[in-house]
Curated annotation (Swiss-Prot):
Transmembrane segments: none annotated. One of its GO terms (biological process) is DNA-templated transcription. The N-terminal domain is essential for RNAP assembly and basal transcription, whereas the C-terminal domain is involved in interaction with transcriptional regulators and with upstream promoter elements. Keywords: DNA-directed RNA polymerase, Nucleotidyltransferase, Transcription, Transferase. Belongs to the RNA polymerase alpha chain family. Residues 1-235 are annotated as: Alpha N-terminal domain (alpha-NTD). InterPro entries: DNA-dir_RNA_pol_insert, DNA-dir_RNA_pol_RpoA/D/Rpb3, DNA-dir_RpoA, RBP11-like, RNAP_asu_C, RNApol_insert_sf. One of its GO terms (cellular component) is cytoplasm. Its EC number is 2.7.7.6. This is DNA-directed RNA polymerase subunit alpha. It is an enzyme of class 2 (transferase). Disulfide bonds: none annotated. It comes from Methylobacterium sp. (strain 4-46).
Length: 339
């Protein structure tokens, strides 16, 4: 149908490359190409805004410091005033596996630095920047603090973090929940066949370590996908009935299943895609050595794939006579119910 050409005939990106940064758990550059002219800016801007505003994270929302009534106080034996201490507390990076508010405590005696690593946490909370300096204590000085940690998204100012029944001395803190700290993107020209008028989108994502850059990008894309679904106000025409199945295949029909249906991690799936491994039949003919030569493909991804294949009774390095078959896409559709 003519209507379907609106989306079916557009160029779709078929290459996604993840380049780890100086700290792979926090920084990565993701390159997607080719894109229709203008789509690089459209997608890059949308992904950037969602990455910075809409991902869930954890942050300190309030603090109570023994002997302190308000944030404009000073503490005997502590070189920083309370305002500076609160500013430092705002930058504590936290990973929390619970949606419920949690408490953390800190108690330390001088002299010396007080760091985020001195905070006592419970099992499902982790401090990601333990070297962060909160304040400095003189000889004989002591400081005790109790923090409230909550989960949310985006930026929430301190006045919205003050409970209605807040006790005297509770200091609300500006909360930056987003695990993404910085996002930038650039658009370059790229080639699609003989056509040089296509976009290449390069995005650099930095996080606080609570989530990997590539996973953060995947979550942002899913958010956009879900938000746009309501605008699709039509059903696509049903495809014609499939032709009768062939009586026999010379290999397991499961080999016709696409690897992107295996529910692999984002990194493993991207590595297979960049190596043009589309079907399970393509994958199992690869040896372990060949897989490890794939860019950005490590031992962790290898073990993950081996486990998934083993659950299907398959393994790497298999010999599959008759692979790949002719009309593989048609065969995959016809035998879909068999796997």
């Amino acid at each position: 149908m003519v209507i379907q050409k609106n989306w079916q005939e557009l160029i779709k990106p078929n290459k996604l490359e993840v380049v780890p940064g100086h700290d792979p758990k926090r920084v990565a550059t993701v390159v997607a190409e080719p894109l229709e002219r203008g789509f690089g800016t459209t997608l890059g801007n949308a992904l950037r805004r969602v990455l910075l505003s809409s991902l869930q994270g954890a942050a300190v929302t309030s603090v109570h410091i023994d002997g302190v009534l308000h944030e404009f106080s000073s503490i005997p034996g502590v070189r920083e005033d309370v305002t500076d201490i609160v500013l430092n507390i705002k930058t504590i990076a936290i990973r929390s596996n619970s949606d419920a508010p949690k408490r953390m405590t800190l108690r330390k005696t001088g002299p010396g630095l007080v760091t985020a690593g001195d905070i006592s946490t419970i099992g499902d909370i982790q401090i990601l920047n333990p070297d962060l300096v909160l304040c400095t204590l003189d000889e004989g000085a002591e400081i005790r603090m109790e923090f409230t940690v909550a989960t949310g998204k985006g930026y929430v100012p301190a006045d919205r973090n003050r409970p209605e029944d807040a006790p005297i001395g509770l200091i609300p803190v500006d909360a930056l929940f987003s695990p993404v700290t910085k996002v930038s993107y650039r658009i370059e020209n790229t080639r699609e066949g003989q056509d040089l008028d296509k976009d290449k989108l390069t995005m650099t994502v930095e996080t606080n370590g609570a989530v990997s850059p590539e996973d953060a990008l995947a979550y942002a894309a899913r958010i956009i996908q879900d938000q746009l679904q309501i605008f699709v106000n039509f059903e696509e025409p049903r495809k014609e009935e499939a032709a009768p199945l062939a009586p026999q295949l010379p290999f397991n029909p499961a080999l016709l299943k696409k690897v992107d249906e295996l529910e692999l991690s984002v990194r493993s799936a991207n590595c297979l895609k960049n190596d043009n491994i589309v079907y399970i039949g393509d994958l199992i003919q690869k040896t372990e050595a060949e897989m490890l030569r794939t860019p950005n493909f490590g031992r962790k991804s290898l073990n993950e794939i081996k486990e998934v294949l083993a659950a299907m009774g398959l393994h790497l390095g298999m010999d599959v006579p008759g692979w790949p078959p002719e009309n593989i896409e048609d065969l995959a559709k016809r035998f879909e119910e068999h796997y």
